[in-house]
Design a protein with these regions (language model features):
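Glycine/tyrosine- and acidic-biased, solvent-exposed loop/turn segments at the edges of beta-strands
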Residues: 18-505
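Bacterial N-terminal signal peptides
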Residues: 7-17
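Bacterial N-terminal signal peptides that target proteins for export
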Residues: 1-7
Length: 505
């Protein structure tokens, strides 16, 4: 260190007529250490205090010397200048209790020294003052009983050392004092059976260790004592088929492992033991076809996996018949054409998907394969023209959707292709004049809708355009109506006639 020499005269003792320095504070550059004896620049053994500083001139240590030998209590400091430890020395060797501190000055460790080595019980402390750990030492080597504690002071663990290594039985405790674990050490490694417990005292897991490594079947238990899992270990890694059970004791899962990751067959089960789901793993990722089953054993779904992601054509089946649906997936998202089938195996619908949502044309078919409806979707929502068809392919109706809502004019046709109705929609409700036509195109009748309900006068016409009837509506209810003979001779309608008129519009 490049430090300026600095001496502080603490006092002196006169021996005869020669003044001899009895106490100084020495800097590092003022001294030299030879065979364990500290000498000053004049070659005299140091008696006084010896200081060492960090490069920023913050004190690093302050050590007491008598005749060049450490004697008394020395102190160590961190780079902030805060004391870290007090070390007692006798004749150049640590002797007594060394104290180590937290930065705020609270006690962190008490270390017993004898003849320069740790001897006795070393204690470490939490910042709240409670003991954290007690470890027995013999000539710097851990030997004998040891204990660790929770921050509230309750016992956490009891174990022992021999020749510096953990040896023999060890017990770990919960905060409340109940046993959490029981295990054994040999030469600092776990050997034999290791048992883990619930707070109730019931066994939670059991595993055998060989040379510090898990070997054999680890058995996990529910708190009521029922088996939860059997997991095979070899050289500290899961190897082979693990089995996992439900709380009622029935088998839930079996999974094959290699080097502690899933590799090979994995299955889920119904309560009666039949396979519910079967998949295959490679390097912890699903690969190949994942098959789901009904309880009857029939295939329910088939999903293709590549490196843990669904890619390809997925299929869903009816329990008692055949294919129900086919869907193409790209990176676990539906993309492309999806096909849907009825229980007779006939195509019932096909739709296009993009980014997991319906997007584009959907077509619906009857049992004979004839087109019955055609619609358009944008991001899973009806949007655009919607058409229905008769069996012969003629248009039955047309409608318009905007963001899933009926908007605009819906047209309905008869089997001959003639316009039968014009129905205006606003925000999914009939709004405006609904018109009905004869097959020849003549107006048969018209009525006004307000907020989805018939309101006002309905006029019905003969083919020649003369009035056939007039009916007054109020909020979808026919109040009164008259039949007319080509616009003449009104006759009050019966309740039954009003009902028929209401149904027709």
């Amino acid at each position: 260190m490049n430090l300026r020499p600095f001496c502080l005269l603490l006092g002196f003792v006169l021996l005869g007529t020669n003044p001899v320095l009895a106490g100084y504070t020495y800097k590092e550059d003022d001294t030299r250490l030879v065979n364990g004896v500290l000498y000053d620049i004049n070659g005299d053994p140091v008696t006084g205090t010896y200081e060492v500083f960090y490069e920023n001139n913050i004190r690093k240590s302050l050590m007491p010397y008598v005749n060049g030998i450490l004697n008394g209590v020395g102190s160590l400091y961190n780079e902030k200048g805060v004391k870290e430890a007090d070390m007692p020395f006798v004749d150049g060797k640590a002797e007594g209790i060394a104290l180590v501190y937290y930065e705020d000055g609270r006690l962190k460790e008490k270390i017993p020294y004898r003849n320069g080595k740790i001897n006795g019980v070393m204690r470490t402390f939490f910042e709240n003052g409670n003991v954290k750990e007690r470890i027995s030492y013999d000539a710097d080597v851990r030997s004998g009983p040891a204990k660790s504690y929770y921050e509230d002071g309750s016992l956490k663990e009891v174990y022992a050392y021999a020749d510096g290594k953990k040896e023999g039985a060890a017990t770990v405790y919960f905060y409340d004092g109940s046993v959490a674990e029981e295990l054994r050490y040999s030469g600092d490694i776990i050997v034999g059976e290791r048992n883990v417990y619930y707070k109730s005292g019931n066994l939670k897991s059991r595993i055998l260790y060989e040379f510090g490594r898990k070997n054999g079947n680890m058995q996990n238990y529910y708190e009521d004592g029922k088996l939860a899992a059997v997991i095979p270990y070899k050289d500290d890694k899961i190897e082979g088929e693990g089995a996992f059970y439900k709380e009622d004791g029935t088998l839930d899962l079996t999974v094959n492992y290699k080097d502690s990751i899933r590799d090979g067959a994995a299955k889920a089960y119904y309560p009666d033991g039949k396979v519910k789901l079967a998949a295959n793993y490679q390097n912890d990722l699903k690969n190949g076809t994942e098959t789901e089953y009904f309880e009857s054993g029939a295939v329910k779904t088939e999903m293709p996996y590549v490196d843990g992601i669904v890619n390809g054509v997925g299929r869903e089946y009816y329990e008692t018949s055949g294919l129900k649906m086919e869907m193409t997936y790209v990176d676990a998202v539906a993309n492309g054409t999806a096909k849907f089938y009825d229980q007779d195996g006939k195509l019932s619908a096909e739709a296009n998907y993009k980014d997991g949502k319906k997007d584009g044309t959907q077509k619906d078919y009857d049992k004979n394969g004839r087109l019955v409806a055609e619609s358009n979707y944008v991001k899973d929502v009806l949007d655009g023209e919607y058409k229905e068809f008769y069996e012969d392919g003629k248009v039955k109706s047309t409608a318009s959707y905007a963001n899933g809502i009926l908007e605009g004019l819906t047209l309905v046709y008869d089997t001959a292709g003639n316009l039968s109705y014009e129905i205006p929609y606003v925000n999914n409700r009939k709004e405006g004049k609904v018109k009905r036509y004869y097959p020849g195109g003549e107006l048969m009748g018209e009525v006004t809708y307000e907020k989805g309900k018939k309101h006002g006068m309905l006029d019905a016409y003969n083919k020649d355009g003369t009035l056939m009837a007039k009916v007054l509506f109020n909020k979808d209810e026919a109040i009164k109506g008259y039949s007319l003979n080509h616009g003449k001779d009104p006759v009050l309608m019966s309740e039954e006639e009003l009902k028929l008129i209401n149904e027709a519009y």
